Amino acid sequence: EYPKELSKLKTIFDWNKYDNQFKGKWVDYIETEFDRREHGFWFLNKKQKTYITGTHYMYLQWTKIDIGLPEFRESNRIFFIYWEACKADTRCFGMCYLKNRRSGFSFMSSSELVNIGTITKNARLGILSKTGSDAKIMFTDKVVPISTNYPFFFKPVQDGMDKPKTELGFRVPASKITRNNMDKNEEDIEGLDTSI
């Protein structure tokens, strides 16, 4: 469960305002979450040691779906392991996945889209659906809320609105260059230059 003290923080800029004592209290928790995102997570499921991938962990831990938080399903675990194999195999260009309705695939794929979008530099990620309006609904009803629900430490710098209608831009917001601010040597903020 996400600690209440951290849930108040919305961006890394909020985190930077706190003192080292506060940061020291939470740095292990944050590093553990990054480790689980990258390497996956082992847990006991009915007394059976069970591994889930980092992508599956992000889906279960940080994705809210239409009924609340997703439940663990063995079929999803197998799907995510197979998906990691597809990503690791340089000969693979993706997968064809036949599914039934109400299987959670739209939320799983939206979760993966946000997960990849928040760690990848210089990427353009998209949604393909049977119609443009269906893709837009998936973006506004699934992708954006998943991104919004991420804790501050997984959120890169974002340009634009907090609930965008057409694009999530993980880049430094543009600012107007004038004679007065041309020579300012402010702290450089680095963005991913990635958009969904």
Regions found by a protein language model. Give the residues of each.
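Phosphate/NTP-binding elements of NTP-utilizing enzymes
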Residues: 1-196
